[in-house]
Amino acid sequence: MEQQNHIYREIKTPSTVSLRVKGSKFIGYSFNITSKDDVKERIADLRKKEHKARHFCFAYILKNNKSIQIVNDDGEPSSTAGKPILRQILSKDLTNVLIVVVRYFGGIKLGVSGLINAYKSAANEVINKSGVITKYLQEYYQLNFKYTDINDVMRIIKKYNIEIIKSNLKLECIIIFAVSMKDSKHTIEIFEKNHGLIINKLEHGSIKKTL
């Protein structure tokens, strides 16, 4: 059974849905995001695209541990828009996602429960349309070895489909690779069985400084 702290879920593809509730038009948008700047950019683009809309309500979650969770009712009564959207994101166990529901007012007030249901439905539909993909958290390692060992190293990399991030293949070789957290222990054991190979775990932020 997969350990839950080794995986995270995102939407497969950005999508759009539309529904009408008592004359009001609700358009749901989903986006993959990696930063708060992404959110600002997507919202700004939508405000230009849907410039006649009255409300741009949204919720988003960032980080694989879901540590950043933000909601915005954009003028709707408190907790009638952003929170219902967020609850749909959480119900699908998603992260790194922005859901925006744009509302064109149709002249009829929907009331608190009506608004909650409308924003909930739009968010749920756009998430379902986007689909969900499960991803594995990765760890990064630096492998140091002599060029005479390159055939053995590359054989292991090919056999276990290991992702090479960077490499410097000279007399003294360096390869930086990524491996899913769930497979990291097994992968390290395989490399350590080969004498002369030196392997060290890297912090993700240090990769750019290496090589």
Task: Please give the residue ranges for each predicted region.
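N-terminal positively charged helical leader segments and presequences
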Residues: 171-172
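Short amphipathic alpha-helix segments
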Residues: 144-162
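Short glycine-/aliphatic-rich beta-strand segments at the starts of folded cytosolic domains
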Residues: 132-147
